[in-house]
Each structure stands twice: as structure tokens, then as C-alpha cells.
Amino acid sequence: MRSKTFTTHRYGAAWTLALVMAWATPGARAAHDTDTIPQSVQAAMARANLPLQSLSVLVQPAGSGPAILSVAPKRAMNPASIAKLVTTSAGLDLLGPTYVWHTDFLTDGVIRNGHLRGNLYVRGGGDPKLVLERIEAIYAQLQAQGIRAIDGDMVLDNSAFALPKHEAGGFDGEALRPYNVQPDALLVNFKAVILRFVPQPHAGYATVEVEPAMAGLRVPKRVRLQGGRCGDWHQALRADFSNPRHYRLRGAYPRACGEQEWPVAYADPQAHAKRALLGLWQASGGQLRGTVRWGHVPAHATSLLRAPSLPLGEVIQDINKFSNNVMAQQLFLTLSPQQPATFDGAQQTLAAWWRRTLPEQPLPKVINGSGLTRQGQLSAAALAALLQHNLRAPYAETFRQSLAIAGIDGTVKRVGHQRGEAALLGQAWLKTGTLRDVASVAGYVRNTQGQWLVVVGIINHEPARGGRAALMQLLAWAAQQPTPQARPH
């Protein structure tokens, strides 16, 4: 998967300074009870058939001052993906924004006349974003060392993580959705295959491009075009991705859709890295005489190349802006003190960090670091306290830039363009969460006075469909509220 290009909006130290000034700026006390749910939010929840009792909210000034809105803020709720804010905050605090993971390439042989006379070992270190173009660059470096052909095997080692057995699709039955991919110490391209459809109108078909090149996977090179609206083009293709050796497209692609991409979790997760790394090696012009297999790096192996990941400060942009589940879980496992890393170890590290950082707040229940669970627990008050803490942290700006900007990017790119949301456009830095029984949002909102607010809203109800619209109304309402004057001490 080609890595995304992020549009960054850098206010630098000026943003933090503005927050500090906002904390000290008195404002008029809001003319409403702090526990009264705004009418616009109530109306949106009514339209979605959501009971008001399913809502937990805390809206407060950044830094200090009385709450503007407080509705059951201490109730333990399933946060869904806003739990990623806990994971990324702990990662920044414990590892630092410049932290990198490493993928090691080693051998038990020698290089002679363009041949690696031995095995090539690839040892994963948990890199959350070992994607197509980075692997291509690594292979170019190996070839620059004189390796054109590997006479032995390509041996893959992912022993840095010890993970429980995972049933693909066990969470919600959607085994081929990339958000359900399990973490892996040697995670290649998010264990996904990307199909790109490019219409050729004069020829009457769309070409089908595949990334990454997957050894042993057959994919149709083209699919016929059809007229009409774009609509549900996924359904129109009548795709079958269940066979990890052969993808089938029995339908047609709507001409009106233009170019589109379809990311699919590979049906045989254990074989994904093997097929992808071999396919990319062959696509680079490299040869392999042996096979690709899982194994362990022997003690006597010598290093050929150590490939660093992107720094953590950049990685968390994917995690928070785009809510990448498997990347969040990779980071979470990195917090585990023991080797191989485990979820239990990561949970213990996170708990100890939380007790040091926010001792007055109840410990959240973070299962896997991503929020993709039915068992997670976190209160709006506790998350608001974390967001307040992060404003004073050395990594405040890095954390803020990892959040999606309303109307600009990430999961809230469309926010601010709907009726009643104009005040949010470019004025809210947010993380959202969605499960069938959860809708959630958390982050920073700048009100019409130019002052910053911390906002957390969580809805737990099955189904929670329509909850996001209610939470957007909450954010829009918050943006219109004056900051209450801090109480005298």
C-alpha cells in the first residue's frame, strides 16, 4: 500500500501559546445548565432512535475552568477507536516521537558474483508501516550490495510478537476488511492487497492493477465497463476474494466511478508476507533459487541491512487521523517490556504509565490498543483529563498534529460541510470512533471567541447508527459556546 501523503497544518509553538493565553482569558458563564443536553443533540439522537441515557459527555475549557457541559462523564463506556488516543499518548510519552522500529536483513552466507550463497533472513521488529515503496527501497539497497540472486531460502522471522490465536473476521464476521487484520512483528503492507481500477472508456473495460505484487496470486487484468451511476461499485463487481491464489471479478465496473481503489485483507494472512516479499523481490529483478518460509534467525547470521521505520511521531498520524487499527496494535505491543511482546505485557505497561500520569483517574480498560473490541472501558472524564495532560506535555504539538482536522483530512474530512457544522471547518482537531454499538469523538475545538475547548462524547447503544450525527451536533454546539470564567481561588 503506497503510503499516504499528509497535509499538515503547522502552527508550531504558536498553537500551544494560543492555548496558554486562552486558559487565562476570562469569558462569560454559559447561560445553560451544565448537565442539560443541547436541543440540537437531543433532536439528532431522537432521529437516530438513541436514548439520551446512552450518552456521556464532557466539554471543558482547555487548561482550567468549570465544565461547559457535563453529562454522566464518569460512566465507564466502550470508547471504540478513541481508545487510540490512550495508546498514542503512552507511546509518545514512553518511547518518544523519534522512536523507530527496525527490520533486519541478515545472511548465513556470502555474496559472490551477484549471488547470495546462503539464506536471506528477514527479521521483523514490529514496524507498523512496512509498505510497498519502503520494501522496494530496501531491495534496491540489497541489490546495490551485489545481491541479484539468492541461492538459498528467504526465511521470515516474526518471533518478536507472541500473539493469541486469531480467527479472521472473528470480531464481526468481516474477514476481508483490512480493519480486522491481526498485528505481526513482520507486518507487510498491512496484510492487505490493493486493487486499483482504471477505466479505459474507448476499450470498454477497466484495467486492474494490484499492489503489492503477490507471488502466486492470479488477478484478472481487466473487467468490463458498464453504464449508469457509480453507486455501489463494490457490489457491481461481484468479487470473490476467498481464494488466496485466485481473485475473481464476475461483474462489471461502472464507468462513472473513474479510478478507484479497493483494499482487501488477504484471505490467508500467514502467507501474505511470504507472497508479498517474494513478489516484490521478483518484480525488482531479483531471483530466488530456494523457497520462502517462516523460521528463526540463527545466532551466527551476519547483518546485511537494518531498515528503520518512519518515526513514531509520523506513524501516529495514520493511527489517529485515519484510525488504522493494526498500526495501533503494533504500537501497543511495542510497549510490552518482555520479548516476545504480548498484549498482557502491553496492558501492564500501560496501566503503570496511567497510574503515574493520571493517578486521580480510573484506569481505562485497553484490550489491544486499537479500540476494536467489545470489552474496552474508558470514561469521558478520564479521556478529557488525558487530553488536558497532553496540552502540557513536551509532545503536545506532535500529538495535536496526529488528530484529524474537521473538513480537511482523515476521518472527519467531510465534517464542517453539513448544515449546522460550518463553525467546525478547520477549527476542530479530532479522533472519532465507530462500532455497531458505539459512536464516539474526542479532541480539541476552537470556539467562535478563538478559545480552545476539550470535548469528549461517547454513545453506547446497539445499534449506534446515527450516533455520529448527534456527536457532530455536539461539536458544533461547543464551538458556539463562550468559555466560562474560571472560579476564583
What residues fall within each predicted segment?
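Bacterial N-terminal signal peptides
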Residues: 12-23
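Beta-lactamase-like hydrolase cores
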Residues: 29-63, 69-76, 136, 141-145
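Mid-domain, small-residue-enriched loop/turn segments at the edges of structured enzyme/sensor domains
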Residues: 54-56, 113-187, 191, 200, ...
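Active-site SXXK
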Residues: 65, 79-97, 154, 186, ...
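Small-residue-rich helix-loop
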Residues: 68-71, 332-489
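Short, Gly/Ser/Thr-enriched beta-strand-loop segments that form substrate-interacting elements
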Residues: 220-241, 302-308, 418-447
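A small/polar active-site loop signature that marks catalytic segments
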Residues: 227-398
